[in-house]
Regions:
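NUDIX/MutT-family hydrolases
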Residues: 200, 296, 301
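Conserved small/polar residues in nucleotide/adenosyl-binding loops
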Residues: 285-289, 301
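Catalytic cores of DNA base-excision repair glycosylases
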Residues: 2, 7, 11-193, 197-210, ...
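N-terminal strand-loop-strand
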Residues: 210-256
């Protein structure tokens, strides 16, 4: 065991977060937790995890469920493609969770990080995890300024993570470095004063903690404007099921007209798409214009 790995494991034993999925070596439970945490903070995902596994305690119960029910139990977590991928993957397992890294990696919605986490936590296999926390810790400690989102950077950090991995205790080390990045070596205001790696941290000695890790590209944002139409007929409200192949696929929503710019009420009501929608709704529900109220919400994507 190298000095870095020992410090991480020792720190983890003293500071680890008590989380329900860490009390089990069941690959199914670990898989569910990792998929939830892909786009969700631990504090938010905690209760959702407990509720989800209570209803779907194993692979077979998830595989046998209707997709609509799976989506219902995922409601509130967002990024619903994760739930659809979970359901599809469970159906492909024939009731038994795979036991090798290639098989786990082949599951729908599972990438290299998730496969490494499952295989090391559940089976004790020596696969190093590399996520945002790991990038940050390794970049700062070793003073690596190669962009983490570059091809070169991804290869470099994957090799460095593998080199630092304690092959006798891969689960402890992987959990440790992720928690270390989440709690100790945080993106903003890391606790360098009480860091067990402070004396040998390259970024700290060079005064570059705030500059590392480096990203090559900034995320490009585009403004999208979602104009939702609230159509009412007596006790009924009109909704659509999305069919577009995006993160909201198969979810229900109010009728939507998307525009590239923000529109005034007059401009919106004059849209051909709006007039067409009103005409269709009149045919199907015998509505008049007093039944239609428009509600617009801008969105960034």
């Amino acid at each position: 065991m190298n000095i870095f790995s020992k410090a991480i494991i020792d720190w983890y034993k003293e500071n680890k977060r008590e989380l329900p999925w860490r009390e089990s070596s069941d690959p199914y439970l670990i898989w569910i937790s990792e998929i939830i945490l892909q786009q969700t903070r631990v504090a938010q995902g905690y209760d959702y995890f407990l509720r989800f596994i209570k209803r779907f305690p194993d692979v077979q119960s998830l595989a046998d469920a209707d997709e609509d029910e799976v989506m219902k139990f995922w409601q509130g977590l967002g990024y619903y493609s994760r739930a659809r991928n979970l359901h599809a993957a469970a159906k492909s397992m024939n009731g038994v969770f795979p036991k090798t890294y290639p098989e786990v990696l082949a599951l729908k919605g599972v990438g290299e990080y998730t496969a490494a986490a499952i295989c090391s936590f559940a089976y004790g296999m020596p696969y190093a995890v590399v996520d945002g926390n790991v990038y940050r810790v390794l970049s700062r400690y070793f003073g690596v300024d190669t962009p983490i989102d570059s091809t070169e950077g991804k290869k470099l950090f994957a090799a460095l993570a593998d080199e630092m991995l304690d092959r006798k205790q891969p689960a402890l080390y992987n959990q440790g470095i992720m928690d270390f990045g989440a709690v100790q070596c945080t993106p903003q205001s890391p606790d360098c004063l009480f860091c067990p790696l402070a004396e040998s941290c390259s970024a700290l000695s060079a005064g570059r903690v705030a500059q590392l890790p480096v990203k090559q590209h900034k995320t490009k944002t585009t403004n999208r404007y979602f104009n939702y139409i609230y159509v009412r007929a007596g006790a009924y409200t009109f909704i659509n099921k999305r069919t577009a192949d995006d993160i909201w696929k198969n979810l229900f929503e109010l009728p939507l007209i998307e525009t590239s710019v923000a529109l005034s009420e007059e401009e919106f009501l004059a849209l051909p798409e709006f007039r067409e929608l009103v005409a269709e709704d009149r045919k199907s529900t015998r509505l008049n214009s007093s039944h239609i109220e428009e509600s617009r919400m801008p969105s960034s994507a």
